[in-house]
Every structure is written in structure tokens, then in C-alpha cells.
């Protein structure tokens, strides 16, 4: 019993840090944080991108062939946007540690996404958005959500 309690208390902080959002829950959070029509991109675009980038999972990470890593619900890259302490010559343009992108609270991820989308290439910075969302009916990603 003592071992089980120890395990639970060790894993509890990990569970509290990340989250897999539902589609509508994420849409509501993104809207509250000002992403709806930010730089001309509807909320459906952002939810679509998050679906294909991370499956709405704030703890998603993916290692790239150049040695950088993508983090969080929008898979923000350590080469350009955040600092993971491992990626050589990281620009850290959002001025944040990559670890904050793995939290259940997506405030920092949204703040950084706004910086990225304002950088000149818009949502084209997200490969999944370019390949799966651009030019499609993204309104389906928020259909039925109470926003």
C-alpha cells in the first residue's frame, strides 16, 4: 500500500502538468486567449492545426532530423521559438523555456503562436496546417461548440 501511495504521489504532478483537450474545450480556450481571427486566421484554422500537430495533447513532443524538438499542442520548435537547453544555436524568439509549452495551461503556447504567425509567413509555419488545413473547410473544427 505504501508503494502504491508513493507511486501515485510521484505521478500526480506529471498528470497535472499536461492535458489532452477535447476539440470544443480547446476552441473555447483559444478563443478566450484571442486566437479567433488573429492575423486573419479563424478559430477553425487553429483547432485544425492543433489536431494534426498534437492530437490536442499539450505534452506532445517530436524530435526533428536537425536535432531540434517540437513541443506542445501546436508543436512549437526549439530551433526558432523556445529554449530546451539542448538545441544548438536556438533563437528562442518567444523568450520562453520549451517546458512551458507542455503545461495544461496553453497561455504561453498561444502567446508564442501569435508571435510565430506574425513573423511574416503566417500559419504556413505549421507543416500540418499547410498540408491538412489550408484551403479546407476549417469551420467543421468548431461546429457544435458553444463559443
From Swiss-Prot:
Q: Which CDD domains match?
A: LYZ_C (cd16897)
**Which GO terms label this protein's molecular function in UniProt?**
lysozyme activity
* Keyword set, alphabetical order: Antimicrobial, Bacteriolytic enzyme, Disulfide bond, Glycosidase, Hydrolase, Secreted, Signal
Q: Which cysteines are joined by disulfide bonds?
A: 24-145, 48-133, 82-98, 94-112
* EC numbers for this chain: 3.2.1.17
Catalytic-site annotation from UniProt? 53, 70
Q: Where's it found, cell-wise? A: Secreted
Query: GO CC terms on record?
Result: extracellular region
Any remaining note in the record?
Lysozyme C is capable of both hydrolysis and transglycosylation; it also shows a slight esterase activity. It acts rapidly on both peptide-substituted and unsubstituted peptidoglycan, and slowly on chitin oligosaccharides.
Report the protein name in the record. Lysozyme C-1
* Species of provenance: Anas platyrhynchos
